[in-house]
Amino acid sequence: FSEKENHRKYDWYVFNSHWCYEKFRYAYGLPTHKCCVIKNALPDIKWKDKPQWQKGNPIKLIHTSTPWRGLNVLLGSMELIKRDDIILDVYTSTKIYGTQFEEQNDKQFKPMYDKMESLKNVNHIGYKTNLEVIDAMQDTQIFAYPSIWEETFCISAMEAMAAGNMAIVTNFGALFETC
């Protein structure tokens, strides 16, 4: 990208967020007339009508990312919350990248997995398919994602908001644009 003569080899540069586009435009001097932003879309599924949360019911949070993208921050927060009526369901695993990746990388997150098991207000669900995660989002109120990762877009946040969740995210990468 940094070699200007290569720009004529490409018809278009397509980005999934304006944040990502601006980063590449600035870093590589991309020709703006060859750039466009096409944001991610949601799967064509039937979204449930979510009943309004009622006082006295538990507040259910959901986290649906890989372990290295801020889960440690969220678990630290949950450790400080001393309430039985605030529950976090964590859908995280290295398995999403395949068995070989999981075998090579999952061990380093064992202390984090152990911490989840020790917190009574945290449920470590692990890996589930995207449709299973979307279904679970429809039974929670808050999508919690204190990301330490510069996301180019956050499809999980978009899915969670479509499921009627409030999104609590950091202002990092393109998260401000997604949420």
Where are these predicted regions, by residue range?
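Conserved donor-binding/catalytic core segment of Leloir-type glycosyltransferases
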Residues: 53-69, 75-79, 89
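Nucleotide-sugar-dependent
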Residues: 68, 148-155, 176-177
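Nucleotide-activated donor-binding/catalytic signature segment of Leloir-type glycosyltransferases, i.e.
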Residues: 102-131
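Short alpha-helical segment that forms part of, or immediately flanks, the ligand-binding pocket
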Residues: 134, 157-162, 176-177
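Acidic donor-binding loop of glycosyltransferase active sites
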Residues: 138-152, 165
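A short, active-site helix/loop in glycosyltransferases that binds the activated sugar's phosphate group
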Residues: 3, 9-35, 42-45
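Short glycine/acidic-rich beta->alpha loop that forms part of the nucleotide-sugar donor binding site
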Residues: 151-154, 161, 171
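Short acidic/histidine- and often glycine-rich active-site loop of Leloir-type glycosyltransferases
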Residues: 171-179
